[in-house]
Regions:
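Helix-biased detector of long, well-ordered alpha-helical tracts
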Residues: 1-229
Length: 229
C-alpha cells in the first residue's frame, strides 16, 4: 500500500469486515468517512469519541494534534471535553522538545476549553521523528448527534474557510527557509498564521443551530475526498 489514507476498498475488506457490533450502547459505528463513534449514557446524552495521529510534520505538532481531534468531535455535533495523548519520540530526543510539545498541547486545550486527561509517553527506536496520537471525548444530546452519513439528497453543501488551509500552514512552517528564497517574508508569515484558523468549533455550533444534516472535517484527500467520504 502507498503512503496516505488506506483506500476505501481496502478499508472495507481488511478493516470493517472484521468488526462486529455487539454493544447496544454504541450508537455510532465505524464506516467510511465516520471519524467518530458514540456511546449512549443515560436517556438523552451520548459521549462521542475520536482518535487521530499526526505523522506528517513535527512543526507545531502539539497544536495540530489537539485541533484535528477536537474538529472531529465538533463535526459530530459534540462539545469537546478532553483528550488523552500518546507521544512517541525518537531515540535521543531532548527533554526540551517534549516540554515544548506539551506546552503546545496545553495552550491549544486552553483556547478550546478542554482538558488533558492523561496519556502515554515513550522513547522508541521505531520512529525517526515525533508521533502524536490524540483520543478525544465530547458530549452531545442523542437527538443532536450528527453523522457523516446523514447527508440527504437536495442538501446544500457549505465549506467554511479555505481549501488547503492546514496543509499550507504546515508547508510554510516546515519549508520556511526554502520559501523565503523566493517569497516575501510577509506572505510566508501569513501562510504560517493559517494555523490560527484550524478550529471548526465555532462553525459547527452555527451549523447545529440551523439544523445541519451532516458535517465532515476536511483533511487528507481535500474537498472532493471529503465529499466522497
Amino acid at each position: 500500500m502507498e503512503i496516505g489514507k488506506v483506500p476505501e476498498n481496502v478499508l472495507k475488506r481488511a478493516v470493517f469486515k472484521q468488526i462486529r457490533h455487539r454493544r447496544e450502547e454504541v450508537i455510532l459505528h465505524p464506516g467510511v468517512g465516520e471519524d467518530c463513534s458514540a456511546v449512549a449514557v443515560g436517556e438523552d446524552e451520548a459521549l462521542v469519541f475520536s482518535t487521530d495521529p499526526i505523522t506528517g510534520t513535527d512543526k507545531g505538532i502539539g497544536n495540530l494534534a489537539v485541533h484535528i481531534t477536537a474538529n472531529d468531535l465538533a463535526s459530530s455535533g459534540a462539545e469537546p471535553i478532553g483528550i488523552m495523548t500518546t507521544i512517541i519520540l525518537p531515540d535521543g530526543t531532548r527533554e526540551i522538545k517534549l516540554r515544548r510539545i506539551m506546552e503546545e498541547i496545553e495552550t491549544a486545550c486552553s483556547k478550546l476549553k478542554i482538558e488533558v486527561m492523561g496519556g502515554h509517553t515513550e522513547i522508541s527506536d521505531a520512529v525517526n521523528r515525533p508521533i502524536i496520537n490524540v483520543t478525544g471525548v465530547g458530549k452531545v444530546k442523542k437527538g443532536k448527534l450528527v453523522s457523516t452519513g446523514g447527508l440527504k439528497p437536495g442538501d446544500e453543501i457549505v465549506m467554511t474557510k479555505w481549501a488547503g488551509l492546514e496543509g499550507t500552514s504546515i508547508i510554510a512552517a516546515e519549508k520556511e527557509e526554502k520559501l523565503l528564497e523566493t517569497l516575501p517574508r510577509e506572505l510566508v508569515d501569513v501562510a504560517k498564521g493559517f494555523k490560527e484558523y484550524l478550529s471548526v468549533i465555532p462553525e459547527s455550533k452555527i451549523a447545529m443551530e440551523v439544523g445541519v444534516s451532516a458535517m465532515h472535517d476536511v483533511t487528507e484527500g481535500g474537498v472532493f475526498g471529503a465529499l466522497w467520504e
